[in-house]
Structures are given as C-alpha cells and as structure tokens.
From Swiss-Prot:
This protein's encoding gene: gpmI
Cofactor needs: Mn(2+)
EC number, UniProt record: 5.4.2.12
Record's protein name: 2,3-bisphosphoglycerate-independent phosphoglycerate mutase
Pfam families, sorted: iPGM_N (PF06415), Metalloenzyme (PF01676)
Cofactor note: Binds 2 manganese ions per subunit.
UniProt source species: Saccharophagus degradans (strain 2-40 / ATCC 43961 / DSM 17024)
Catalytic reaction(s) noted: (2R)-2-phosphoglycerate = (2R)-3-phosphoglycerate
Residue numbers binding Mn(2+) 1: D404, H408, H464
Length: 516
C-alpha cells in the first residue's frame, strides 16, 4: 500500500455556475443536500470565468478548454480567440504567411479556396468574424473561386440562431463582390469528437463529392427548409447550395482548404479525413490532392499540415511546478472532460510530468446525455475515493462532466438529475477526504445549468453562461477566501495550501487567508 497522504483535491464541477435566482436554475431546483451544507458552512467566494479574466474578449462566455488552461496556468492566457481578434483588428491577419500562401498557391493555378468551420458568434470553437475575414482575405488577394462550407452551431448559441450569421456572411460577400456559401450542415455531423465517423462522413462527402440530403438556392433558404423539417442548427442535415443548374460546389484536386476553427478538439477528426495518409475512419469515395490544408491553430501535434497560429509555450503550469518540487499528482475524469484535466490543464502538453498519474473513465455511449444524466460520475467517484485513500497523492485534479454535458441538451429535468448525481458524488468524496485528513477546493470552469432558458431569445439556453462560479474550501484549516478572484487564481491558491512556492510566471494571486 502507498503512503497515506492528506491530499488536496481540486474538484471541477463542469458547467456549475452561481446564480441566486431560482428562475431556470437547475442547481437550485435540485435536491443537493451536500452542496447546500458546504455552501452554507464552509469558506466560500465566487470567481470569474469569462471575458478578459480568462483571456477572452469582454463579455465572451468561458468554456472548458479555456477554463482548464487558466486553472492550470495560474495566469491569464490570451486565448486563440483573442489572439486572432487582435490580428484582424491590427491587420496582421490579412498578411499571415500561412493563409496568404494557401490562397496564392491555389489562385495561381486557377483553383478554388474553401473556407470551412463553425459559422457562429458563440466564440467557443470559432467565430463568424474570423470566417468572414478569411473570405475577405481570399477575395481581396484575387482568388476568383472562394467558397465557404458553414457548419451550424445551436449548442454554444441558441438552438435556432444560424440565420443571422448566414445573412451577415451573404451581405459581406455581396459587398466584396466575390465568394459564396457552398454548403451548410450541423455541427453534430461535422464536428464530432467521439469517433462517430458515420457523422463526419456526411460532412466530408458533402464538401468533397457534393453528396447532400437536400439542396437549396441559398444558405438562408436551406436553413429555413431545415427548420421546416424541425431540425435545429446543430442537427441540420447535409445541404448543398446550388446554382440554377443544380450543380453543387465540390473540393477538387489542387484546391486549398482553410479550417477556421481555433479550438482543436472538434476539428481533429474532419481534418484527419482530409490529411491523414493512413486514415481508416470511413471509406472515402475520393480524396482530393489539395494544394494545402491549413488548420488555424494546431489541432494536434500528430497532424502533419500547415498551421496559421502555432501554439505558444506555457511554462511553469501547476503540473510542472508540482513535478519540480517532487510532488505526486493525479488527473481523473471521464472521456468527455479527460483532455481538459490533462492536456489543457497542463498548458497544452500531452506528456505526463514526473510523478503524474492519469485515470480515464469511459463516458457512456448514448446519443445525448439527457438519456443518462449521471453519466459516469459513480465510476469516477469510486476511483477518486480509492485514490484519496490509497494513492499517496499530494494533489488530485478531478472533473465531473455532468452539469455541462447534460446542460447542453437543454433538458431541465435531466439537468436537475445531473446536479443530484454530482451532489451524491461529492458526499462520497468529502467522506473519503475526512477519513484521511485531506482537503478540497470545489469550483467550476464555467456556468451552464444555473440558467437553462433565455428569456430574450425565447429559446432554451443550451450554451455556457457568463455568470461567476462558486469556490468553496472543504477541510480542517481555519481559513477565509478573498473576493474578486478568477480561474487564474486557483493554481496559486492550491500551491499556497500545499506550501509550494509560486513561480514568477504565475501572476494569479493566492485567495487563501490563513488565520493567525
């Protein structure tokens, strides 16, 4: 048996925001005695998870990738979203050498430029302004065949909100005097991340072979037809936008494809379908010999293709500091959030640090998580309790995915059950910590289930919120937590509790005040 230690656990309740209002609030509607007790009796505060506090534009909701990177970094990391916004604002975007080479090489051979990505103002995986800017770059550099293949959101935005970005794009292209939206399809198909290749194939076949369930004369007409079929944005079936002759636009040999998503996880599978020489996800009728395939950010170090905005090094994150100080750490989550407690929490590093262990618990194989709101929380909890009692860890980072993943479905009753499942898990975790004399910080990476309906849009609120999230200390020490913090302050706070020096690169602040 390993040495029994008194670990510090960081428990991340994904999508568990803070709102005093009971209106549309699945947390306040849930039977959650464990949560209510610690919130009433323990040192607590709320912290910011959105906007400039996490390196995003002001007012922009946070997300799991940004949240976990900020949690682990202990500083504000200017996210790719902000980085690209800044490049567009100062003009550097339009001279980015990777983008311009892709456009110029295709144009010089009379070939087409295809801009693909999530056309949305959600700002989680992409932004419509980036896609429109890319179309503008191509048209202004003289490319005559410039096409957009738009993936529709409805997950990080209201379920039926795609009309505005489609109209905005059509109006901009009309003003530019070039470019066309060539196809639309829901992100459910194009941006799968769980190896459901049958979905991705529908997006690939649409763009490469023009194989479509439906055709339309314009993108907005195609969307309206989808709504008539009762398809929300996320689930819009493959629709080719055709001219009067009925012929779809297809990606051909010598064309350039530019993928404008800046968040990697949901861009990898479709990218691999285009560029992986050993691809075996599905049978491709045709694989175009592209002049270039550009990923806007590095979707994976293993993907061998052009990258417009390569990663910037992030040194002395929490995991690295722990390793340098000879400490033992564990990262644990189910599949949906495993990358977040590992890759993102480690500042974009795939490999393990010295003294780091990882536990991956498979997520349930269901169509949507409202079918199983408890997800794999019981299995995560069983392994977490064992790690607390027997693992000999100094620090444990754990994510419970339920509130975010179920909250995205918009199902209020299922979201209440998700909260209750997490509450039951917390009861077991706290009991284990008490048995070994351990302690915990409970927080979230962003909100979701505390606001499940959008009064203004008159639709379900399936996306993240900009509300603050709780931070609670559970343990025997007599401490208080300072107000006005953010996710960037969590790593410094953990290091203070562990009596590990905070490196200069971490400019977040320790929120713990120890009683004298």
């Amino acid at each position: 048996m390993s040495e029994v230690k008194k670990p510090l656990a960081l428990i991340i309740l994904d999508g568990f925001g803070y709102s005093e209002s009971d209106k549309y609030n699945a947390i306040n509607a849930a039977k959650a005695p464990t949560w209510r007790k610690i919130w009433a009796e323990n040192p607590k505060t709320t912290i910011a998870t959105s906007g400039m506090a996490v390196g995003l534009p002001e007012g922009q909701m946070g997300n799991s990738e940004v949240g976990h990177m900020t949690l682990g970094a202990g500083r504000v990391v200017y996210q790719n979203f902000t980085r690209i916004n800044k490049a567009i604002a100062d003009g550097d975007f339009y001279t980015n050498p990777v983008y311009t080479k892709a456009v110029d090489d295709a144009q010089s051979q009379g070939k087409a430029v295809h801009v693909i990505g999530l056309l949305s103002d959600g700002g989680v995986h992409s932004h419509e302004d980036h896609m429109i800017a890319m179309m503008e770059l191509a048209v202004k550099r003289g490319a005559e065949k410039v096409y957009m293949h738009a993936f529709l959101d409805g997950r990080d935005t209201p379920p039926r909100s795609a009309k505005a970005p489609l109209q905005k794009t059509e109006e901009k292209l009309k003003a530019l005097g070039g470019g066309k939206i060539a196809s639309i399809i829901g992100r459910f198909f194009a941006l799968d991340r769980d190896n459901r290749w049958d979905r991705v194939q529908q997006a690939f076949d649409l763009m490469v072979d023009g194989k479509a369930a439906f055709t339309a004369q314009s993108a907005t007409a195609g969307l309206e037809a989808a709504y008539e079929r009762d398809e929300n944005d996320e689930f819009v079936k493959a629709t080719a936008i055709v001219d009067a002759d009925g012929k779809p636009v297809t990606i051909e040999d010598g064309d350039a494809v530019i993928f404008m998503n800046f968040r990697p996880d949901r861009a990898r599978q479709l990218t691999n379908a285009f560029v992986d020489k050993n691809f075996d996800g599905f049978a491709r009728a045709r694989v175009p010999a592209l002049s270039d395939f550009v990923m806007t950010t590095e979707y994976s170090a293993d993907i061998d293709t052009s990258c417009a905005y390569p990663p910037e090094d992030l040194v002395n994150s929490f995991g690295e500091v722990m390793a340098k100080n000879g400490k033992k750490q564990l990262r644990i989550a189910e599949t949906e959030k495993y990358a977040h407690v590992t890759f993102f929490f480690s500042g974009g590093q795939e490999s393990l640090y010295e003294g780091e262990d990882r536990i991956l618990v498979p997520s349930p194989q269901v169509e949507t998580y409202d079918e199983q709101p408890e997800m794999s929380a019981p299995e995560v909890t069983a392994k977490l309790v064992d790690a607390i009692e027997n693992g000999g860890y100094d620090a444990i980072i754990c994510n419970y995915a339920n509130c975010d993943q179920v909250g995205h479905t918009g199902d209020f009753d299922a979201s209440v059950k998700a909260v209750e499942a997490v509450d039951a898990a917390l009861a077991e975790v706290f009991a284990a910590l008490e048995r070994v004399g351990g302690e915990a910080l409970i927080t979230a990476d962003h909100g979701n289930v505390e606001l499940m309906y959008d009064d203004e849009a008159q639709q379900l609120h399936t996306q993240h919120t900009t509300l603050p999230v709780p931070l609670v200390y559970v343990g025997k020490r007599d401490i208080s937590l300072e107000q006005g913090g953010s996710l960037a302050d969590i790593a410094p706070t953990m290091l203070a509790l562990l009596d590990v020096p905070q490196p200069t690169e971490m400019n977040g602040r320790n929120l713990v005040k120890f009683s004298k």
